Design a protein with these regions (language model features):
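Glyoxalase I/VOC metalloenzyme domain signal
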Residues: 3, 14-15, 22-26, 50-54, ...
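A short beta-strand-loop-beta hairpin characteristic of the jelly-roll/cupin
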Residues: 117-126, 131-152
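Conserved short histidine dyad/triad with adjacent acidic residue
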Residues: 26, 76-126, 160-162
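Double-stranded beta-helix
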Residues: 8, 12-13, 17-22, 27-31, ...
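N-terminal leader/capping segments at the start of a protein or of a new domain
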Residues: 1-61
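Ligand-binding loop in jelly-roll beta-barrel domains
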Residues: 69-74, 138, 147-151, 160-184
Length: 189
């Protein structure tokens, strides 16, 4: 990553006072050779609602997936490098491998060469409600029939739609995501 991420986790001591139990870089980081330069930093994960506020010092020691557990959440920061040098070379197998490594090959929409009218080889759809905050740089939010240029300070509420993130600039883009398990059968409005 271009800048280090510091994660501070609080908890309680034996007397119930608030304390810092962890202060340092994230311990769950994933990169994929099929998507060069993309770095996923998992910061925290929950697997129940309401979320447990006690428990393990590091909730990210389990395998990293794209989607949160049922009734869970994922909090992460993803850095997207400029993609102009490699995006046109992404094969269907590359896209499947990149998403398969996150346990989410089922989420891929188009499989690499964007068949079926998909606009980006990494178009995907999950049954999650995602809050995205662009921290630095800029990135296009690619949807089925439109695109939105997102810049630092912009927020997206992504509601289980087919989408991709495309950095067409010459600088990295860093986005914070909170993914919440959702119910995509509740209707589309």
């Amino acid at each position: 990553m271009s800048e280090k991420i510091r994660r501070v986790v609080t908890g309680h001591d034996a007397q119930g006072r608030s304390i810092v139990i962890s202060d340092g870089p994230p311990t769950s980081i994933k990169q994929s050779p099929q998507r060069p330069g993309v770095v996923i930093n998992n910061l925290w994960m929950t697997d129940t609602m309401p979320a447990q506020t006690s428990g393990p010092e590091d909730a990210t020691v389990k395998p990293m997936g794209l989607e949160p557990a049922a009734s869970g959440t994922n909090f992460r920061i993803v850095e997207f490098p400029p993609e102009t040098d490699y995006i046109g070379k992404v094969s269907a197998a590359d896209a499947q491998k990149a998403f398969g490594d996150l346990g989410a090959s089922h989420a891929l929409q188009g499989g690499g060469q964007a068949p079926g009218g998909k606009r980006h080889p990494f178009m995907h759809k999950t049954k999650t409600l995602d809050y995205a905050l662009v921290l630095s740089g800029e990135c296009y939010l690619v949807l089925d029939d439109s695109e939105v240029l997102m810049k630092a300070g912009d927020v997206c509420v992504q509601r289980a739609t087919s989408h991709a993130w495309s950095n067409r600039s010459d600088k990295p883009c860093k986005i914070a995501f909170i993914l919440i398990d959702g119910d995509a059968t509740a209707g589309h409005h």
